[in-house]
A protein has these predicted regions:
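Short, structured surface patches at the beginning of a domain
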Residues: 1-131
Length: 131
């Protein structure tokens, strides 16, 4: 699977942008998914709607062009948006056949809060390596 990583920088956050990158990259290495694009939204943009944040336009263009199969984020909480906005993003990505994966816990992030099983062989060492 080809992946796109998205990271949201926040000034008062538990993870720096660098730590988020490490979590996502460790997950990609463990799963052997190549990363075709890394996108970042700078601190201060987390109050904006997801669609207006840096990187989101590029993400949706890449999705429409079939450049990836999966979006990798630390987890849903690190997108800093409400559930309706998250549902909209997930639905838009699924329209293009892109699923969203939470690198922190190894779970797929799906509309309606559905949870799929953790991928076989995936454990918390990806996350625990930072703490």
């Amino acid at each position: 699977m080809k992946a796109i990583c998205f990271m949201q920088e926040v000034k008062e956050c538990d993870l720096t942008i660098r730590e988020q990158m490490l979590v996502c990259r460790r997950a990609l290495r463990k799963l052997r998914w190549p990363c075709v694009l890394e996108l970042f939204a700078q601190a201060g943009t987390e109050e904006q709607p997801l669609s207006l944040r840096p990187g989101m336009v590029e993400l949706l263009h890449a999705a429409a062009n079939g450049e990836a199969d999966v979006l990798v984020v630390v987890d849903a909480a690190h997108l800093y948006c409400g559930r309706p906005e998250l549902e909209g993003l997930l639905a838009s990505l699924l329209h293009y056949g892109i699923h969203t994966f939470g690198a922190k816990d190894g779970n797929w992030i799906e509309p309606g809060g559905r949870r799929w099983m953790v991928l076989p062989g995936y454990d918390e060492e990806v996350w625990n390596g930072l703490r």
